[in-house]
Amino acid sequence: MNLSCVTIQAGLQRPVRLLHLSDTHLCFADNRDCQRKRDLAASRIRYFSGSNETLESYLDEAVAFARQHDCLIVHTGDLIDFVSHLNLEKLHERFALADTFFAVGNHEYSLFVGEAKEDNAYKMQSFHHVQDAAPNPIECASRQVGGLNLVAFDNGYYRFSTAHLDFLKAELQRGLPTILLMHTPIHTENLARHMRDVRKEPCAYLCGSPSHWLDTYSEQRREQQTPDQPTLDFIDFATHQPLVRAVLAGHLHFQFADLITPTLPQFVAGAGFHNQATLVNVI
């Protein structure tokens, strides 16, 4: 396992260890699925290590590490690459093997990957199937461990909702230091520049990007990633709360650490399909 380590200051009486995973992209399909889906599985796995067995061995390694080092696994989405009978079964089975808290990604809802506009109507075609397989509520959820509050949101389509904001406000009433989990990272200038200048990406694939970035995107990507008012309201509130100590995200397939505000770090996990993981020591 390619392991990196970060420390988050939260003022806990005892340290809490999290093993942060993201973007595994399992690509299973079987005879219960149509031929198109089976062909998709064979095609997509080539991008993600070339073998589902290899991906599962990476997950086995992470579970063994978490058990050995008393870690709660936190996974920030895209455990599976698309919806299939076997992928959903694998999602359920994998999260049952170790104590896990989950923030859903956009690929958990993908029917054929890129074949349609990803919006709420598209998501709802598979939402209940994904929810049935997941270890916790996927729209928003919380988990308290060792005096720390973990709060997860579904922002896989680059949006937050008023319901997300209401949920966060209620969770902060607990008065506990809080870490936010989400699939899509919140925009920072450093991360956006890295995506453009180092990764040579045509857009930043971030949540809450401002207009001076969006104006350079293609029409499709600009529409996809332009934040609506509930998204802006959520980010403004969440990033200015003293109890919110860090953001954990995924989506980009490489590790990146930056500050959203002078006091709020964001840690983007590397790709699970590259056997990357982050040990998060919360103290």
Region roles according to the model:
Residues M1-L86:
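N-terminal active-site segment of His-dependent metallophosphoesterases
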Residues L26, I80-D81, E108, N149, ...:
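Short active-site segment of divalent metal-dependent hydrolases/proteases
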Residues E61-L72, N149, Y158-D258:
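His/acidic metal-ligating clusters that form di-metal
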Residues L18-H20, H75, F102-A103, L180, ...:
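Residue-level marker for buried hydrophobic side chains located in beta-strands
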Residues L12-R38, Y109, L181-Y205:
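Short, solvent-exposed beta-strand-terminating loops
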Residues D23, G77-D78, G105-N106, H183, ...:
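Active-site glycine-centered loops adjacent to acidic/histidine catalytic or metal-binding residues
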Residues F48-L55, L59-D60, A103-V113, T188, ...:
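A short, conserved beta-to-alpha structural element at the edge of catalytic cores
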